[in-house]
Amino acid sequence: KTVFMSFQNGIGHEAIIQSIVGNEKVIGGTTTQASNILGPGHIMNHGSLPSWIGEYEGGITDRIKEIADTFTAHNLEMIAAEDVKKRKWMKLFALTAIGPLSAIFDLHHTDLYINNKANEVSRGLGKEIILETREVALADGVNVSEDECLFMFNKIVDSMQTNKSSMAFDVQYKRKTEIDFISGAVSKIGKKHGVK
């Protein structure tokens, strides 16, 4: 009955876990919890959106419903996803536009996309990154509209304005980033499908 859930940003890490414990024991998940550590025992929450879990083959099984209901009953809102792969890509659209740029420029969402004098340029660049990522998602069998991609990006930026991406903190503290599972995964999947 043991299952493994990974809420790591990006895509591709589940395959690594599956190669160790088997496909049937791994369920997919995605969460958006914007927070950072202020010090020992002190964490600032900049906002959150519901978490999603699901079977990689699709559909909502009894175990997915049970896990989602248990988390929700303990004040951690979790939704059973019919298509967890699409949910993970939905977050990935935002991550590809927010994480690397936030890390490169060491900026919070507000400074990067809202109060920035070059706001139109940074939002335009973010949109371009998202639309390129969408082309890869479509090639990988994920049916997602342009509006859906941009909605998630805008929702994260607008609801978590004081947040700085985890990638920016990783760079700041000289930790390994999740870039291989975010932009790197998009590049790898794009090459596999011949997307340029």
Predicted feature descriptions by range:
Residues 33, 86, 152:
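Positions that flank functional sites
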Residues 20-25, 40, 44-145:
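Internal alpha-helical scaffold of NAD(P)-dependent oxidoreductase catalytic cores
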Residues 13, 59-63, 99, 163, ...:
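Short phosphate-engaging motifs
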Residues 8, 55, 173:
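Conserved residues at beta->alpha junctions
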Residues 10-11, 64, 130, 183:
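Generic non-transmembrane alpha-helix signal with a bias for helix starts/N-cap capping motifs
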Residues 1-42:
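Rossmann-like NAD(P)(H) cofactor-binding subdomain of soluble oxidoreductases
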Residues 73, 125-196:
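NAD(P)-dependent Rossmann-like dehydrogenase/reductase catalytic/cofactor-binding core
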